[in-house]
């Protein structure tokens, strides 16, 4: 049986599920997963957090732009909050105090709530710390926990409501691109045609890329 889609996404982890949800608002989408269930690998086993000051300014800016989505998700498609206040503490060893100051100078521009707390406050928050090794800690009051399973389940429910198709247990193979316009995907008992393939295969992304 051959089916046609506007987009075929390979990999039903958080990247693939997110892309599937947003694209399904205005397009016909197939989400194809090799395992027997979605979120089988890293996406289903992660303790996720929302960190405003993370990695580099570009990543931080993208993170901040996505915050409203997480905040408003309960009103859009989720019965329960996707994010909850958590707070994050980064321990500053006695040998790294100067580096902590540099870090704060860099990241406070994007996350003004960051603060250097002294050893006594850090020890009160995390009593198991070794006092002789700790100079203090950087406290991030804006760090949030993300309910990964709730997020993915909510995205998938909305994806299904939009008419999206989830195909699990399909070891998809890219066969050819006909006339430079249409990808042909062999998904075992299914044949899928699409002008656009999205590689969301995570750790297997290189394998998918080589098929193209």
Task: Give the ranges of each region predicted by the language model.
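Dinucleotide-binding Rossmann-like beta1-alpha1 core, especially the glycine-rich loop
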Residues: 47-125
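Glycine-rich FAD pyrophosphate-binding loop
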Residues: 24-43
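Conserved Rossmann-like nucleotide-cofactor binding loop
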Residues: 15, 37, 204
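Helical element adjacent to the flavin cofactor pocket in flavoenzyme catalytic cores
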Residues: 138-196, 200-207
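Redox-cofactor binding/interface segments in oxidoreductases and associated redox assembly factors
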Residues: 10, 52, 199-200
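Helix-loop-beta segment of a Rossmann-like dinucleotide-binding subdomain
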Residues: 80-90, 103-104, 110, 116-119, ...
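Beta1/beta-strand and adjacent pyrophosphate-binding region of the FAD-binding site
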Residues: 2-15, 30
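Gly/Ala-rich phosphate-binding loop of Rossmann-like dinucleotide-binding domains
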Residues: 20, 24, 158
């Amino acid at each position: 049986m051959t089916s046609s889609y506007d987009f075929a996404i390979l990999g039903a982890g958080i990247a693939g599920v997110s892309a599937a949800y947003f694209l399904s608002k205005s397009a016909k989408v197939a989400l194809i997963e090799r395992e027997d269930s979605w979120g089988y690998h890293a996406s289903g086993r992660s303790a996720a957090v929302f960190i405003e000051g993370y990695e580099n300014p570009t990543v931080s800016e993208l993170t901040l732009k996505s915050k409203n989505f997480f905040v408003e998700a309960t009103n859009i498609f989720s019965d329960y909050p996707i994010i909850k206040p958590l707070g994050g503490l980064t321990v500053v060893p006695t040998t790294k105090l100067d580096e902590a100051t540099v870090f704060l100078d860099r990241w406070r521009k994007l996350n003004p709530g960051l603060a250097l707390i002294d050893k006594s406050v850090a020890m009160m928050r995390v009593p198991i710390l070794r006092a002789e090794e700790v100079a203090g800690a950087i406290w991030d009051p804006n760090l949030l926990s993300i309910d990964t399973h709730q997020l993915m389940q909510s995205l998938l429910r909305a994806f299904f409501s939009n008419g999206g198709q989830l195909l699990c247990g399909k070891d998809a193979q890219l066969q050819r691109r006909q006339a430079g316009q249409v990808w042909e995907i062999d998904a075992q008992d299914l044949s899928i045609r699409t002008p656009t393939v999205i590689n969301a295969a995570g750790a297997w992304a290189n394998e998918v890329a080589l098929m193209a």
